[in-house]
Amino acid sequence: MKNKQLLCVLFPLLVACTGQRHQQQVSSESIIEEAVRKGEVLKGEIVPIDTALFRYAYRMRVQGDKAVILDLHNADYYYHVFTYPDFQYQSSFGKRGEGPGESIYAANIRFAGQDTVWVLDDGKGRMYQYSGIAGGKTPKQEKDILLDKRLFRSLDFDLKDASTVVIPDYSGENRFSWASLSSGELLRKSEQIPVSDPELLRESAPAVAQGWNSFVSFSPDKKILVSVTQFGDRLDIYSMASQKHIGELGGDGEPQFKVSPEGYGLPAGRICYYDVQVTDQYIYTIYDGRKFKDIMKLADAYQQGGKILRISTHEGDVVKTYVLDRPIAGIYVDELSLIHISEPTR
């Protein structure tokens, strides 16, 4: 297995985006074609990692001087700890398996303190808290929480505070579910899926929720929650204080899907957003936009990930769009210095 590499993009290339506000209403194909024609493709600086750990580096989280990378397809452990920003390997945790304390399918990871993280296992419907996420320490599982059965298919999450987690609602009854981090109990549900066909939502709510599968991110101050759709060009911003909702529909349109005879929502349009991170000033997203029919034609040549980096204000205005020199799946944005991007492998 070849050594994994991380793609780093110097942030000074991005800060010039302020003042160029516009709505993103053109297709992803047009964006990439225009960038290539003008020679405006953003090239990254490679940071090699002296290890062959990764098969599919999917998410990166950073806290102080340490970084944790989630590898979806690792045979032994899902999570790997590195020093930051030099990326020296420290330890691995989150053993893959079906035994007690092991994970069947890791969905995401969030820091809950300087050396503490929460992780989500969709396969078991459980959340685990680990301590010792630092150089020279051994990660230790501190908590094992069984999520409420009404939170079925928990595919992403973020932490509202030390006691509450938000998870996209896969039942279709609402947009979000809120659960206790001490008991796993469902506390409440909020918002509605903003599908353009309300009748479809009433008739096939679970299928709509699957078609509108979303990734979520809180702002650092927890004042806004942002969601982006995996199979459509839709970004939504929710104010926690005022309950104000801003919805932005891009040029590739809302999620397209078919309802199967069994009631499942089968994606039928495009693969769109891969990741979202909200910072103090902006919303950063990685976007693909390729049609499934075109992906099928690529067969083994298909590379997962998006090449479009969008930067938006907290009000949803797109201030800058960059095209990257390779497809990537996950980002970590440090607005003071670097953007670190985990690059997936086939």
Question: Where would I find each of the regions flagged by the language model?
Answer:
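Structural signature of eukaryotic scaffold interfaces centered on beta-propeller domains
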Residues: 58-61, 108-112, 155-160, 208-221, ...
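Conserved blade-ending motifs and adjacent loop-strand segments that build the rim/top face
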Residues: 253-262, 317-334
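Residue-level detector of conserved catalytic or cofactor/ligand-binding positions
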Residues: 336-345
